Amino acid sequence: MIRKVLLSVLLAVLMTINLGQASPEVMKNLCMNYGKAMDQCKQELNLPDSVIADLYNFWKDDYVMTDRLAGCAINCLSTKLDIVDPDGNLHHGNAKEFAMKHGADDGMAHELVDIIHGCEKSSPPNDDKCIKTMDIAMCFKKEIHKLNWVPNMDLVVGEVLAEV
């Protein structure tokens, strides 16, 4: 279950990679593709629009998610993308494959999975998987900021709207 949360964090945020200036571009691609199932998750979980705003604001350096439904949305997206196994654990191969399919090289994909595992281990215990996912996501965001891999969400939204 905890690994599922990490995977969800990876996906929720998982949109990036290529150890250098290309990393924000890779993260943008990861984010765009991670979010493609959002309409389905929004409907299944009856998510309010405020959750979408939470996820949009997620990458802002000083933004802190507080709505547990955002964690639920990340869990839903990760499940839809088969980044977690049937037991809810992070599926390393699928997570790495997802990252590489959307622009990450082997090193970046491996580092993303490692970051999620580190965040999973350092996050406080919580029986509420949605809250646990939010904790892991916030840790993941912090680590991505340290690497300067943060995607430009205005570009992500612009490209998503262009596809619609």
From Swiss-Prot:
Disulfide bond positions: C41-C76, C72-C130, C119-C139
Signal sequence extent: 1-22
Keyword Kinase applies: no
GO molecular function: pheromone binding
Protein name, entry field: Pheromone-binding protein 2
Record-stated family: Belongs to the PBP/GOBP family.
A GO biological-process term: response to pheromone
Keywords assigned: Disulfide bond, Pheromone response, Pheromone-binding, Signal, Transport
Record's function text: This major soluble protein in olfactory sensilla of male moths might serve to solubilize the extremely hydrophobic pheromone molecules and to transport pheromone through the aqueous lymph to receptors located on olfactory cilia.
Tissue specificity note: Antenna.
InterPro entries: Odorant/phero-bd_Lep (IPR006072), PBP/GOBP (IPR006170), PBP_GOBP_sf (IPR036728)
Disulfide bond in keyword set: yes
Pfam families in the cross-refs: PBP_GOBP (PF01395)
Species of provenance: Antheraea pernyi
